Amino acid sequence: MIDFRNRLIDVQEKTVKAQGYLILNQEEKANNLLKEAFKDVLVLAKSSSPIRKEALAVQALIEDNLTALNKIEDVKDPKLVFDFANSDFIPQHLIAFEDSLYYFNPYYKGIIRTSGDTLERINADYGFNLAAATSFGLALFSKPDKISFLKDGRLEPAFALELPKSDTVFIAMTSFKDSLYFLEKGTGMIIKYREPFFENADQPKYWIQAQEKKALGAKSLEVTGSVYVLADDNAIWEYRGGLLLDKTYLSVFPFPQKLAKITALPSLSGLAVLEPSQGRIILIDRQGSLIRQFRSEDFLNLKAVAFSKDGKFL
């Protein structure tokens, strides 16, 4: 009992010290100390703890402070744009292109387009796994190697990309300038294809230099000038010129558990990081510093996010 009491006093002292930092506008110091205190109090707030009631009160105080410091905006009632619950289509992916939103899944033959209150079905002979907005149309990829472009509302005939290996599987795709970038399943390797895009037009190139470290088991990919890869351990790897430049673990509260996807913010100013298991979207700048977090119960099991051109809506 005495040990539990002393540990709680230590947590309370850290909390008071952090409050002092806040008065002095030293938010980073306060944030770091409160995160430390929060980890300490979790053990004391367990059901078996003899001081659980007091520990829970301290935990709530710390959590309130961390919520404010970590720029969490709770979204109570996000506006419903379309409800696919009673249709024959279940969207698994979403992408914004020009002034429309496009929804697709690998089992639905075609793609759904919405603009305002208008819904349009664009038929195809196959479903799509990945998509990327480019200056020459919306690129749509169907495993293992088919790619086609949607231009002016018309889906052009698909053609086959040459794969680097016969057993290559792509799990993420993005675009930058005149190139498409693919993330290879399991290996963390990135394959780059350059314009023009037609069958066998460009030999696939492994973009990361051969001797450089790769994020094995990586889950997501984005390019904003640097190439960012979301690794299986929640680290974000930054590459430039085919070389590993940096590896970042997000220092945010709530502590990341299972980050799922990264996508570029408008004007390539940073990244949005999706964590559906905690119902949130984390916005960071290119250096990995926190911009803002959006949290909602409606974001649990979130699969994708898209932004308006001006960045005011998601």
Where are the regions that the model predicts?
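Conserved beta-strand positions in repeat-built beta-propeller and related beta-rich domains
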Residues: 98, 103-107, 139-145, 174-175, ...
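Amphipathic, non-membrane alpha-helical rod segments
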Residues: 17-52, 95-96, 100-118
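Beta-strand-rich domains and repeat architectures in extracellular enzymes and scaffolds
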Residues: 79-112, 125-130
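WD40 beta-propeller blade core
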Residues: 110-112, 148, 191, 237, ...
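A short beta-strand motif characteristic of beta-propeller blades
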Residues: 76-86, 117-124, 156-164, 199-214, ...
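Repeated scaffold domains used in trafficking and secretory/extracellular systems
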Residues: 85-93, 125-136, 166-178, 212-224, ...
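Alpha-helical linker/edge segments of TPR/alpha-solenoid repeat scaffolds
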Residues: 57-84
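Short loop/turn segments that connect beta-strands within beta-propeller blades
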Residues: 114-118, 151-154, 194-198, 239-244, ...
